[in-house]
Amino acid sequence: MNYAIDKFTGTLILAARATKYAQYVCPVCKKGVNLRKGKVIPPYFAHLPGHGTSDCENFVPGNSIIIETIKTISKRYMDLRLLIPVGSNSREWSLELVLPTCNLCRAKITLDVGGRSQTLDMRSMVKSRQIGAELSVKSYRIVSYSGEPDPKFVTEVERECPGLPSEGAAVFTALGRGASKGFPRAQELRCTETFAFLWRHPVAPDFPDELEIKSLASKQGWNLALVTIPEVPSVESISWLKSFTYLPVVPARTSITAIWPFLNQKTSINHVECVHSDTILLSANMAPTSSENVGPTMYAQGSSLLLSAVGVEKSPAFFILNPGENDFVGVSGSIEQDVNLFFSFYKKNVSVPRKYPSIDLVFTKRNKEKTIVSLHQRRCIEVMMEARMFGHKLEYMSMPSGVEGVARIQRQTESSVIKLVSNDDIAAHDKSMRLLSPVALSQLSDCLANLTCHVEIDFLGLGKIFLPSSSMLSLDDGEFIELSPNLRSRILSFILQMGHTLHGFSLNNDFLLVEKLVDLQPEPHLLPHYRALVKEVKTNGFECNRFR
């Protein structure tokens, strides 16, 4: 601006005749201004930092030269967060309001925190300040200031923070919490992640079965639950989540994880320090693919060589990395180069296993002959089903030190889970392996011997197998029924064409494939093809009353 009012004389002064030793105010908004001039720029007046707003027609920011367009002042907001104590005190959850920081000033601020008024000294807000908030559908807001508040705080901070929804759920996430305590409001629902749902109506929502729900104690008519979204939710679940939370559902983040060796630690977001090993097992989750029929392509960059490999499965896709003599290796996806993992290796005095880490099962036949099979091998299902039918004894199970798995047992009337962990005993066939604890081995042996039990053994990336009960088998002279390769491919193609995913599925297990076929609900125009497949499945010896 070219003119300003001298604060002491009250006269209008031209910028070219003003002196830097006097004090001036804007003739329009009466806020403080100062004289700006230089060797090239002609003299002009500009508002002091923190004084005046863009509402003033003469407003010129004090930290810039004369410009035609005034930038919009960036707003800061109060943040509503959810506090959930760890452990048994989780029923004492509460809400808090996080206030933006302000410059030191002698003033007080009065806030409405959900029907309750609270006054704070703004000198306590130089650092981040949190105050308790009530459960309310009304907005949390700044009511008034008293004294001389920080002008920048008054200008930049939005006076209202949205309250809780009257219908549906407010969603809080543990990601992006920063230095403040508590969980902030979520802006989207990302697959594979866990969120806190807080709602009042409806009292008992009909959560889809594929969501993992952990309910917490209710308070003042409000319900709270921790909800975990699966990696690939169904269309029905996505629609339900959108209608209940009014938030979009987005795919899981692409990630690369080091599964083996266990002696590794993350030193930063994408840097892993790892004991030097000839075998490193990696898992690529939700990595992009170039084709629907293949898994993701991964690159490994050493000191002088770039290698690539294509995964068999889509997600998770498993890769084996041999670092050779490299002390530093980078691994990344072929499409999304931002997703990468860097390995640095260190030597360890103890010997490192040279073989692929595996879960081994040792069975003893009636003639005392021993059979050793690894859980990830194709013939494992055949060996274990033969052992169940002919009463072969499970001598022991061995695994790398530190590995944990589970055995899920489904009986006719109940189900149970056996935790499979190793002890310090060394396996007879491999000194680098440790034996399953005797208690877990005894329980697992009993379940394998009981032909009425469904048994599923799951060690994640090291192997997974499902053994059906005898009611699902049709045996003739000791031979096991199986699908022909042609029929197996046709069933698999039919399932995939209907848009179904096959999580945890193994090409070695025909029973899971048939069970997946049984659960399908094909459209009317697909029923003839479906019935033809069912007929051929029955011809192969599989029996199931649920077939149409």
UniProtKB/Swiss-Prot annotation:
Full protein name: Druantia protein DruB
Cell compartment(s), UniProt: Cytoplasm
One GO BP: defense response to virus
Main subcellular localisation: cytoplasm
Described purpose of this protein according to its UniProt entry: Component of antiviral defense system Druantia type I, composed of DruA, DruB, DruC, DruD and DruE. Expression of Druantia in E.coli (strain MG1655) confers resistance to phage lambda, SECphi18, SECphi27 and T4.
Keywords: Antiviral defense, Cytoplasm
A cellular-component GO term for this protein: cytoplasm
Phenotypic consequence of gene deletion: When this gene is missing the Druantia system does not confer resistance to SECphi27 in E.coli.
Record flagged with keyword Cytoplasm: yes
UniProt source species: Escherichia coli (strain UMEA 4076-1)
